[in-house]
Amino acid sequence: MVLIRVLANLLVLQLSYAQKSSELVIGGDECNINEHRSLVYLYNDSNFQCGGTLINQEWVLSAAHCDMENMEIYLGVHNLSLPNKDQKRRDPKEKFFCLSSKNYTKWDKDIMLIKLNRPVKTSTHIAPLSLPSSPPSVGSVCRIMGWGTVTSPNETLLDVPHCANINILNYTVCRAASPRLPTQSRTLCAGILQGGIDACKGDSGGPLICNGQIQGIVSWGNHPCAQPLKPGHYTHVFDYTDWIQSIIAGNTTATCPP
């Protein structure tokens, strides 16, 4: 009963936030061309796509489950069919996973750090995003973005990224939706409780941005997407900042937190 009351109170709170947000469709509205300079498009010749985030001139952060063969990394992209003049393509020079392997699970350690084969310069449509200086608070309004499907369960992929606002929720909300989840996890629970806005297929690996910092990585969610009371799961970047900074500094044997 206590959990039901908590969910009911959170739903009222979410409804008040939703009135301030953009139209409730999966993926939100088309992103402003200048608001996603750190957003990266990962793609291969098998039409597998993911998002990522540029965190400095030669490093990209994404989800471990976004690893793919023949990965192509595009930066400064808005319209996939109409390249920007400063758009760049890079290849992965090295990829790093927790415990120096693909030893992640659906619930934990879904993080991949990619070193580019060549650095990129900051430009009109390319700029890195800061790592978090502190974890986000429950109730924080954060931004998701990506080229993923804007409908579910049927898929509709567009050439431009869509952006939307969602909220950081208490982890117990995600456990209520998925009782098999562990009692603790290095993931963030985020979404809109009444549904209608969500990251979805094709958005994996992209950022959850709160106060100008990357706080989460799109990891997994329910299908169909954007169901009421079934928020999404995001890798909690703050928990991995020491690992990320160690790898970038050259300590390639650094291990992730337990």
Swiss-Prot record:
The cross-references to PROSITE patterns, in alphabetical order and at most eight, read: TRYPSIN_DOM (PS50240), TRYPSIN_HIS (PS00134), TRYPSIN_SER (PS00135)
Cysteine pairings via disulfide bonds: 31-163, 50-66, 98-256, 142-210, 174-189, 200-225
Q: Which residues form the propeptide?
A: 19-24
Q: Which residues get glycosylated?
A: 44, 79, 103, 154, 170, 251
Task: Look up the domain of life of the source.
Answer: Eukaryota
* Keyword annotations from UniProtKB, A to Z: Disulfide bond, Glycoprotein, Hemostasis impairing toxin, Hydrolase, Protease, Secreted, Serine protease, Signal, Toxin
The entry's protein name is Serine protease VLSP-3
